[in-house]
Curated annotation (Swiss-Prot):
Protein name: Sex-determining region Y protein
Coiled coil ranges: none
Keyword annotations from UniProtKB, A to Z: Activator, Calmodulin-binding, Cytoplasm, Differentiation, DNA-binding, Nucleus, Sexual differentiation, Transcription, Transcription regulation
GO biological process, one term: male sex determination
A GO molecular-function annotation: DNA-binding transcription activator activity, RNA polymerase II-specific
Organism expressing this protein natively: Mirounga angustirostris
Location of the protein in the cell: Nucleus speckle; Cytoplasm; Nucleus
Alphabetized PROSITE patterns for the sequence: HMG_BOX_2
Length: 218
């Protein structure tokens, strides 16, 4: 009897320990781990070095626009940040060299302090992501209306044809595009395409066999 009570008490104690864990959110459970506390303190994933998170020292324009940007944003809460930057850039250009000089001195002082604090600092700008090239062909310009009708892309032909006909006709079309006059390209190539397709379809293996069987022997 004593052993049964101990086992039931043990199960109740285990359930009491597990109930609060299920009632808490995943964010609370995540922040209890030591690795998560380290991430919260460092502000990242813990793998980045301090040099990667060091900001560049401000230049003269940044020193000057630090207070002016705040004032313009308060006066114009609906203005976007890009518009504020344009306005501040225009105002900065309108200042004289004498008016800019105190901000240049402050920027030099900040750069010297930054150099002493981070002697191994090197500015590493982020590379812009290159736009992915699309495999789809763009439509031709309006000035090449004639050539647009005879492009190699099969979807652009105004008539139907077989693959064997198109594969044999494409090299011929490319040769004519490089050597013939641009005025009569569309008409001549379309006529050649129709003629070649009609002859190739007419001279199929079955048709050739019929012709050979019908020819008289020598």
């Amino acid at each position: 009897m004593f052993g049964v009570l101990n086992s039931s008490d043990h199960r109740a104690a285990v359930q009491q320990r597990n109930i609060p864990a299920f009632g808490r959110t995943s964010f609370e459970l995540w922040t209890d781990s030591p690795t998560s506390n380290h991430r919260c303190e460092t502000g990242g994933n813990g793998r980045d070095s301090g040099q990667n998170r060091v900001r560049r020292p401000m230049n003269a324009f940044m020193v000057w626009s630090r207070d002016h940007r705040r004032r313009v944003a308060l006066e114009n809460p609906q203005m976007q940040n890009s518009e504020i930057s344009k306005q501040l850039g225009y105002q900065w250009k309108m200042l004289t060299e004498a008016e800019k000089w105190p901000f240049f001195e402050e920027a030099q002082r900040l750069q010297a302090t930054h150099r002493e604090k981070y002697p191994d600092y090197k500015y590493r700008p982020r590379r812009k992501a290159l736009p992915q090239k699309s495999d789809k062909l763009l439509p031709a310009a309006s000035s090449s209306t004639l050539c647009r009708q005879v492009l190699v892309d099969e979807k652009w032909y105004p008539f139907t044809y077989r693959d064997s006909c198109s594969r044999a006709a494409h090299p011929r079309m490319e040769d004519h595009l490089s050597s013939s006059q641009p005025v009569n390209i569309a008409n001549s190539l379309l006529q050649q395409e129709h003629h070649y397709c009609s002859t190739s379809l007419r001279d199929s293996p079955e048709t050739l066999a019929m012709h050979l069987s019908a020819d008289p022997p020598f």
